[in-house]
Amino acid sequence: MYRTRSSDEVTTSTDLTSSSDVATSVDPTTSVISSTSADPTTSADSTTSTVQTTSAGPSNNIGNSTLANSTTFAVSSTSIDPTSSSDVITSTVQTTSIEPTTSLVSSNDITTSTSLNISVVISTSTDSTSLIESTTTVGPHASSSVAGMYRTRSSDEVTTSTDPTSSSDVATSADPTSSSAVTTLVDPTTSVVISTSVDQTSSSDVATSVDPTTSVISSTSADPTTSADSTTSTVQTTSVDPTSSVVSSAPVDPASSVVSLTSSYPTSSSTVTISANSNGSATLAAQTTSIDPVSSIVSSSGATTIISSASIDPASSVVSSTSSEPTSFIVSSTSVYSTRPSGPTTSTDLATFSDTIILRVSTTSTSQDTQTVSSSLTDMVSSTGSADLSVSSIQRSQVDPSTFAVSNSPVYPTASTGSTSTGIPIASESLSLSRQQGISATSSSSIVTLTPVDSASSSRSSATSIIKPNMPVSSNDSKTQSSVSVVDAFQSTKSSYPSITSADPTTLASENGLVGSSSSAHPITLDRTYASAHASVTDIVSRVTDSTRHTTLVTSNINIQSEVGNPNYSGPKDTTITKQSAFMTSPASTSTISNVQSTASVMNHSIEDNISAAASLESVSGTSTKDYSSQSSAIHYTNSFTTTTTNAFITSKHSIAAVSTGAITSSASISLIMEGSANIEAVGKLVWLAAALPLAFI
C-alpha cells in the first residue's frame, strides 16, 4: 500500500511500552522540545505537530515558568481541514515575544491556506525579531484533486537550524531507509525556495527552483527506493476562454439551405502538459484545437514526447529539455465522407435535396484544470455540397519541447473529387468515464487519520439533427449512466426519455428543428416517410487484472454498418471506409476508402465495441455490443459505413492516461488515474450509452 514513516525514524527516543509511538527529543543547548505522537494502528502519518521553542534561564532551568528570561517562542502547525471539500491545507505560525524589561507580550500569527488542487509555493515569512522562519509548500502530489494519494510530511521529520547572521533557514530531512537527503534553502530577502533532492543510491540530482511571486511551478522530493512517489510539474502556456471554444450557433435559412455560423469565443486553444516519470524521464503532451467558423469543422492536433531531462528557469518559467525520441507524432485525423459515390448536383430546394455530404469530425480535448480527457464527434451534413466527395486527411504535429510551439502539416492527403461548402452539424455525441482517488484526513488529539477515497462517474451527451428530404429524424439526449434512447425529431439536447414518432408518408410536418448541438431551435419544413423504428442495446462489461507496467494503455475497435435501400437508385450503393489510427511513440496511421456493392432494402445498424485498458498495475477490458434494427415503409438508396478505429496509448506510472474512440456517432473518453503501488482492481464501471436512429445516419 502506501509507505508510512513513523515518528521513531526521525527522532531520538521512542516509548516502546505504550500502544502508540511517542517521540520526544530535547536539545540541551537551545532547549528545543519536539513531541509528536502517531497512531501505529493506521497507515497514516501524523501530519499535525507542534514545536515549542523556549529559552530557559540558567538560574532555575524552568522553561516557560520563568518569563523574564524567555524572550521568544514560536508554535507552528499544519493541518488539513477534513470538512472542506476542496482539501485545504492550512499552516499557522504563531510567534510570541516577551519583553523582559516591561513584560509586554506581543504575538504574531501567520496563517496561510492553499487548495490541494494547485501546485504553488504558499508562504515564506521571516520574523526579524526571533529569526524564526516558517515556509509552507505544497508538493506536486497535490497538483490535482484526482492525482491520487497526497503525501503530507509532518514537521517532526525535518530538523531546522536558524543562522542568526544570515536569517536563512537550512532544513534537511533524511530517510534512513532510502538514504535520500533533501535540502531546502530559503532566501528571506527574495523569498525564493530552492529544493535539491539527492538520491545517494543512484547519484542523481534533481533541482527545481520556484519563484513564489509567479506561483507557476512547485516540486517535491521523491523516494528513490519506491515507485510510489514521483515529481510532476504542469505548465500551461496558452490561456483560452474557459466558457466555450466551439461555435455558439448555426442558424439555417430554410429557403436557401444556407448556414450562417457565428462564434463569440476564441476558435483556437492550446494546452501543454509535462509529467515527470518515476524513471527520471518526463512526458510532454501538447494539444491544439481550432475551429473553422465558416464550415464548423473542428480540427485537433497534438503530440506526446518522452523527455529524458528537463529543467525549469525560475525567472521565465521556460522549460528546457532534451529528448532522445522523436517529437513528431500523428495524433489526430479528420475524415470527410460522401454518402453517395455519384449522383446529380445538389438542389437548393430542401424538399428535393437529393445529395447529402457527411463530414465526420472527431476532436479530443484535455482539461488542464480537472486533468481529464474528453472527446467529441461531430457529423456534418452539407446543405450546398457536390457529390463524389471522398477525402481523408491526417495531421502531423511538430512540438518544440523548449517553447511548446506546435506546428501542423498534412501527412496523407487524399484528393477530393468534389467540393464542400457550409456544413450543418447533424450528430454529436460524447461519453466520458472518470475516476478520482485521493485521501480524506480527520484529526483527533493531534493524530491525523488518512482514509482512501475512491469515486467514479460517467456521463454522456448527444445531439443529432438529420436534414434530408423524405428522411427526417433527429435524436437528442443528455444523460448520466446507462440509457438507450430514440427520441422524436428535433427535441432539445436535454431530452431524457426515448420516444418514437411515426407519420403519414404523404403528410408534410413542420417542426422546430434543432441544428447542431446548441439548444436553440430553428424552423425547418420536413417530409417524413418513415413509419416505425425500434432499437435494442446489450451491454457487457468484464474486467481483467494484469500486473503489466508501462504498456499499451487502451485499444479500441469500433465497427459500424448502416444500410438502407432505394429501389429507384441505380448507381453504386455502398461506401466502405476502413480507418486505423495509432497513438504510440512512433508515427503510425493508415486510411483506406473503397466502394462495394449492396442490395439491402432494410436498414440495419450494428455496433460492436471492444475496449481493453492496461495501466501500470492493472488492465481492464470491456465489451459492448449494440444491435439496432428498423424497418421502413419508404426505402431510399443504400449506404454502408464500416469504420474501424484503433487507438493505442503508451503511458507511464503516475500519469493520467486517457483514450478517446469515435465512430460516426459513437465517442468515448476514459480516464484512468493510478497512484501509489496499491493493487487497485476497480477502475470504475465502464458504461456505454448509445442513441439509435431509425435512418441511414447515426
Curated annotation (Swiss-Prot):
Residue stretches in coiled coil: none
Protein induction: Induced by pheromone. Down-regulated by RIM101 and inositol.
UniProt biased composition (Low complexity): 9-56, 158-183, 455-465
Region called Disordered, residue ranges: 1-65, 133-183, 197-274, 455-480
CC terms in the record's Gene Ontology section: membrane
Name of this chain's protein: Pheromone-regulated protein PRM7
Organism per entry: Saccharomyces cerevisiae (strain ATCC 204508 / S288c) (Baker's yeast)
